[in-house]
Amino acid sequence: MSRLPRLLVFAGCVLLWAVRLVAAEYHVAPHGSDDAPGTAAAPFATVQRAQTAAAPGDTVFLRGGTYRLRERDIARTERIFAYVTLLDKSGEPGRPIRYVAWPGETPIFDFSAVKPADRRVHAFRVTGSWLHLEGFEVVGVQVTIRGHTQSICIDVQGSHNVIEQLSLHDGMAIGVWIGDGAHNLVLNCDAYRNHDPVSGDGRGGNVDGFGYHGRKGSVGNVFRGCRAWFNSDDGFDFINSAEAVTAEDCWAFYNGYTPDFTARADGNGFKAGGHAGTPVARLPAPIPRHVVRRSVAVRNKANGFYANHHLGGVDFIHNTAWRNRVNFNLLGRLEDNATRVPGRGHRLFNNLGFAGGEELAQLDAAASTVAGNSFLGDWAATAADFVGLDEADLTRPRGPKGELPVTSLLRLALGSRAIDAGVPLDGPFVGRAPDAGAFEAGTGR
């Protein structure tokens, strides 16, 4: 080949590479067609079709309206699973593939008609990495199996994904469930009014708002700014995890109940660990140490913050519990898998409990590190310690960027004994010492 053709081929390759660096935009709409080009004027109909077109750095805009999924939309069946939308194409570091709501619009994905017999329905299964899902709702996810089972709205198996400002509600499924993958962030999401009346005894014993059950290597996963309420089992459930997870600035309330406060399943706000009856020889090494901080648990059926027999201890830091049956329950077990004992090895700093049926249960304080809390001290919180106690504040709308609503609920009143009652840790504080509880007075946070 002569020099000129070689230069032309090289220039053509460079041009194609440069064009691909310019991120593309695709559109999906309820009235769209998967035979369309995916433009704003001629959008796709399904997220699954948009994935085939998208490449790292691209954005898929989801237009407002209701997407009514059918069984024909199931992307893959595998063993007992039906993956309706399967996101298995990855972005790249710094160039995620984004599936986001069009500004000012609300896409709603309705799975109430997806009822494959004897299958676990996973509405969105995310096995890809470097993806960003933002700003849509998932409703009506079904359960079709009578025995022990679960369905899932957002099933995360990849890494470096962001799940942001999703509302997962009024179905029979877990909201967000992380089973594998590392460094995923679940940010400012809501999971509520989810209950499975079909499987087992009909109490909905597997329907949590948010679940983390990561395999070995699934490190660095975080739930931040999320709310879970009226889920028939737990708000947040971290049982049977091989790696540690963090929940911070999260709220869990009314779990274990239906909206009319009929009792359903377990009803813990934060079930922060445990490995059920797993023999000690089969426990992960090291046993993960979960962290729950700056979080709120209100009026859950059972416990607000619960260690669930977790060996090795859990970190509960700067949390507020109100009106739970037990506000803080640190129950442990012996290595015989049978004997319940007060939990050991826990770290409890600057927590605040108020008006629980019991403030603190099952803690071996001598074998744990405990400081700056309202329990095991010389004072107990009363209503006078708080600016507001209006439970309606828990479900107020989020801020313009998806942030939790700033209200007077459980904020510390001037002169509260919780002010400056904590011990200094790593974070900033106002006054002589940090406050006890989830909210630092004088910061607006």
Task: Map each language-model feature to its residues.
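Bacterial N-terminal signal peptides
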Residues: 9-20
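Right-handed parallel beta-helix
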Residues: 63, 96, 100-105, 129-140, ...
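Right-handed parallel beta-helix/beta-spiral solenoid domain characteristic of secreted/periplasmic
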Residues: 64, 68-77, 83-147
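Acidic Gly/Asp/Thr-rich repetitive segments characteristic of extracellular carbohydrate-active
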Residues: 30-69, 75, 83-87, 435-438
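Surface beta-loop-beta hairpin patches that serve as ligand-binding interfaces in beta-rich domains
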Residues: 400-445
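Bacterial N-terminal signal peptides that target proteins for export
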Residues: 1-11
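Extracellular beta-strand/beta-solenoid scaffold signature
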Residues: 75-87, 114-124, 146-155, 170-178, ...
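Predominantly extracellular beta-rich ligand-binding scaffolds that present long acidic/polar faces
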Residues: 81-82, 291-409
